Amino acid sequence: MSKFDKHKEYKLTLPRKYYEKKGLSGIQNLGNTCYVNSIIQCLSNTLKLTDYLLTNGYKKDDPREINKTKNNFNITLSYIFVLKKLWEHNNVIQPLSFINKLKNIKQVTNEQQDAHEFLLFMLNNLNENLSYPININFSDKLTNIQKDITLKFYNMNKKDYSIIKENFNIMFLINIKCKQCNNEDFMYEQSYDISLSINKSHLLDELLDEYFKEEYIEDKKCDKCNFKGCIKKIYLWNLPKYIIIHLQKFDNNGRKINKHIYYSNSKINYLKYFSPNREARHNYFYDLYSVICHQGNANNGHYYNISKNLNNKI
């Protein structure tokens, strides 16, 4: 997980010294819960989110506080309790209540689970229970196509926006262009992560180039001229403060791809992946601050987390 370098100076409610000295607690495994523990540690070191939850920031955004009419609202409440324990003292905690609530909805079983899937579950759960409606005002400087695309994304998020979407939601603009008549269609997608196949390179920047490169679709028919053959290209439309990069470490048969992927903070500028219709105002470099690691295979393995605190110590 990486954070945008423009936000190195955190605007936190709690004193910076609080985050420099605390949050070094461990989490005891309670059965096959290492995937849960690693995600908790990763999210705990996402300080914009942690500060928001520790200081009850959700009460300021929405007077309803946590929406208890939503599904699994008790998971969110229990996670906040775990978070407070993690940042109370630097020791080992046992998140028994949180794990039991996850067991009740089959998110924790007697078998090994996938950390990436659990991360998405947690982000969706937190977003659902911390969400509030939003409005939008268009700038006079936007072009018609920019207004149209912005409106599409607004309609996708206007009823359930939260600090989760503010900090993690990636917006993609997918361009489909006919090779014959150059007619263009657009699709709009959003995600909490960029999921990369790691087959073609061991360098993260090359894997990203592969993900965002043009793709020829032979059997796609143009809506305008009926010609078969289009070019598909994925663009970024908006990037959040934090980017989650998911490396697909298992193939379609469940076999683990034992391959190291190398990352360079100073090398990747995500600006080059933005849509030409989007006028990005600055470069997009991100600092790596947290990694979920896996040892073993799909059936018998162990997850653990490596994170940096505000002192850049692991």
Indicate where each model-derived feature is located:
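Predominantly the structural core of cysteine protease catalytic domains
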Residues: 89-157, 169-171, 180-182, 214, ...
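Internal, well-ordered alpha-helical segments in soluble enzyme and binding-protein domains
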Residues: 118, 160, 174-177, 221
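Processing junctions and N-termini across compartments
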Residues: 28, 172-175, 215-219
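Beta-sheet entry/capping signal
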Residues: 33, 175-177, 242, 304
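USP/UBP deubiquitinase core
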Residues: 2-143, 242-247
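Exposed substrate/partner-binding surface patches
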Residues: 1-22, 43, 56-70, 86, ...
